[in-house]
Amino acid sequence: MPRVSLATCRAIPNLDEEDAPLVGALADRGVDARPVVWDDPDVDWAEAGLVVLRSTRDYARRRDDFVAWARSVPRLLNPAAVVEWNTDKHYLEDLRRRGVPVLRTMWLEPEQGLTKRQLHTRFPAGDEFVLKPAVSGGAQDTGRYTANEAESRRLAIQHAVRLLSEGRSVMVQRYQPSVDTLGERSLVFIDGQFRYALHKAAMLHGPSQGPEETHIERIDATEASEVELTVAERVRQAVLAIKEELDEPKGPLLYSRIDLVNDDEGRPTVMEVAVTDPSLHFSHHPGALDVFADAIVARLDGS
């Protein structure tokens, strides 16, 4: 019986509620599937079969360890080189250089040694903005600030100072007002094919409350517009080109989620591209779990 290990983390050793049914779906297809904690020292990854990243939510605080682990796994999806690229949001600059419309981002680096005054002068002068670390997941350590309110600006500076002092790169983006009215749209691709779209309501409502803060996601099924599909396909092609430049084999990624918001002109713009362990929210689309399970089995058959 072929073996599939669904990589997760210690906080959710049996996978999250969206991914847990994948074990049964794969079993129905004759696959020995089981959740495995990625940093469990007792696991022999050479005997783990095909390893599929699913609920490895703690990688942001231990990215170097996570990337080293990914590179040590003989059969990993998505591939380790792509994971390394995707776990640092500087990847947005790679996409921008390839002509993909991405949110404009200002990067603050620890080695710049920026003072509080210098941070103050670099932050936007008006509107709202979002501040977060370049290596993060699940909106952890992410805050929404108002540029022309003194207390909000002070908290933003405090937030940036903390992250930079921890040796973490910081990204600053204008908060897109459309998120409050239209939300975000996530387009999910499985094995290179667009499968379904999701709507996520706004979830940032103020300054960061610290690294342990959690945000409640409100997800619904939606339909992708033709313009959104066009942008998402540009992203997919760009990521494929980057994948080949990283010396990974040709062919589509097993999964990807492309998160879009509207810019001030109403044009879909990339906020994030998730190809490491994105939440795919199978329960919101009939058949989505089966499509994903079939795609995994096809990778087994093709190996």
For the regions a protein language model found, what residue spans apply to each?
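Anionic group-transfer/hydrolysis microenvironments
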Residues: 56, 134, 175-176, 188, ...
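ATP-dependent carboxylate activation and anion-phosphoryl transfer catalytic cores
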Residues: 193, 207-208, 227-303
